Amino acid sequence: MSNYVLALDQGTTSSRAILFTREGDIKQISQKEFTQIYPQPGWVEHNANEIFDTQSWVMRECLQEAGIGAADVVAAGITNQRETTVVWDKATGAPVYNAIVWQDRRTAGFCDELKARGLADVFRKKTGLVLDAYFSGTKVRWILDNVPGARAKAEKGELLFGTIDTWLIWNLTKGKAHVTDSSNASRTLMFNINTGAWDDELLGILDVPRSMLPRVTGSSEVVGDIHPEFLGKAIPIAGNAGDQQAATYGNACLKPGMAKNTYGTGCFMLMNTGTEVRSSQNNLLSTVAWTTPSGRFYALEGSVFIAGAVVQWLRDGLGIIKAAPEVEQLALSVPDNGGVYLVPAFAGLGAPHWDQYARGTMVGITRGATKAHIARAALESIALQTLDIMDCMQKDSGIKLAALRADGGATRNNLLMQFQADVLGVPVERPKVTETTALGAAYLAGLATGFWKSEDEIATMWQLDRRFEPNMSDDKRQHLVYEWQRAVERAKAWVEA
């Protein structure tokens, strides 16, 4: 009898494989980082072959280290950095260009052109998204227009497009499956979330041939098998969801009104809105959460581009810490931020501002400011950006959040979690298994193959590690928020278009 589900978690900085038990506990984790490529300011790329090579390597290592064979694995689930775009040759499988990463800003000018043509509402109504360089559609167009010969080949049906899930599945199945799920498709600017299908009008505006696009499947169904060459035996690929949707599922936010925030490279808050699309009036995104036998579920999403990455910047850019975990003790060495506010708009501002021309800004610096104040301001910026999103989410949904479930690497930072509860004014719940992105992919795969019987069973498996209760006066909270909002205004529109 197979006792495990394998999750392949392909992230922005590393590829990981995690084995989960029937109880939803972690048996083994394997991780490998890969190269970040910055060809020009504002451009971010990955080598698509390196992504697949690292992912297949950790998949093998994970099973070897756990001392189990492929026969012990009932199914595999995939979750991935979303929006990152790969275009490859259908015949050879070779990418025609590096993967263009979700953080990449090179298509900002084209997004402005589309807005000037009055098309923002067309895209918002059909896709739930804003016209921003973040999403895949404009990246595909850039590749077709800037890689010699790419457009001609695409129009002959010789090129394929995929987000990272599609690229992994294509390679794992040896080219047998060119598929994506509805959650990933909903991040492309080419998918109509109301009809659940690619949209010809949007494809026409973006000038992307339909023949390039993958077939859209559910998030919890068998779409193909990992070829026996990789692990010695075929394993069904039975779950697929973009990383933030998978984390929402892994946090068991299965009922409308439940919300989670993932603290990773960026910060991503999603609220389950049920089987109806809830349009945002406050610059949030409406997105597909997942499609399961229970139906197509939607979410409101607020995306913060820079969260944990601000701590990496303290380490790599400023050199004020040697390792990321040191930031908590450094920040705790001062009682407050000393009036220093850091707006980490290194790649523009995401929700709810959507300012591609904002840049990182630090204000309130005096001679008394120290590296500890900067460290504290950096951590606080993560929580304050999250507050901006929660305020909008509550207005759009009409739901007062009862608690926020938190996951991702930065949730290990107790100072950040407590400050988050303080500024939100609601409890923050950290689960025992914080690898909820991978867990969500595992749940979706296990559900499709009968490893877990129902979503009710999955909901009962979620376990609390620690609940952080708000402990800040209203006056102090209001002052922090007021100063933060002043700092954000100073970061906006810094780059002159």
Curated annotation (Swiss-Prot):
Keywords of this entry: ATP-binding, Glycerol metabolism, Kinase, Nucleotide-binding, Transferase
Residues annotated to bind glycerol: R82, E83, Y134, D243, Q244
Domain of life of the organism encoding this protein: Bacteria
Activity regulation note: Inhibited by fructose 1,6-bisphosphate (FBP).
Annotated InterPro entries: ATPase_NBD (IPR043129), Carb_kinase_FGGY (IPR000577), Carb_kinase_FGGY_CS (IPR018483), FGGY_C (IPR018485), FGGY_N (IPR018484), Glycerol_kin (IPR005999)
Enzyme class: transferase
SUPFAM superfamilies given in the database record: Actin-like ATPase domain (SSF53067)
A GO biological process held by the record: glycerol catabolic process
Disulfide bond sites: none
CDD domains, A to Z: FGGY_EcGK_like
GO CC term, one of those recorded: cytosol
Residue sites binding ATP per the record: T12, T13, S14, T265, G308, Q312, G409
Pathway: Polyol metabolism; glycerol degradation via glycerol kinase pathway; sn-glycerol 3-phosphate from glycerol: step 1/1
Binding site for ADP: T12, R16, T265, G308, G409, N413
Amino-acid positions noted as binding sn-glycerol 3-phosphate in the UniProt annotation, renumbered to this chain: T12, R82, E83, Y134, D243
Gene3D superfamilies on file: 3.30.420.40
Catalytic activity entry: glycerol + ATP = sn-glycerol 3-phosphate + ADP + H(+)
E.C. number(s) listed in UniProt: 2.7.1.30
Signal peptide, first to last residue: none
A GO molecular function held by the record: glycerol kinase activity
UniProt similarity note: Belongs to the FGGY kinase family.
Known role: Key enzyme in the regulation of glycerol uptake and metabolism. Catalyzes the phosphorylation of glycerol to yield sn-glycerol 3-phosphate.
UniProt protein name: Glycerol kinase
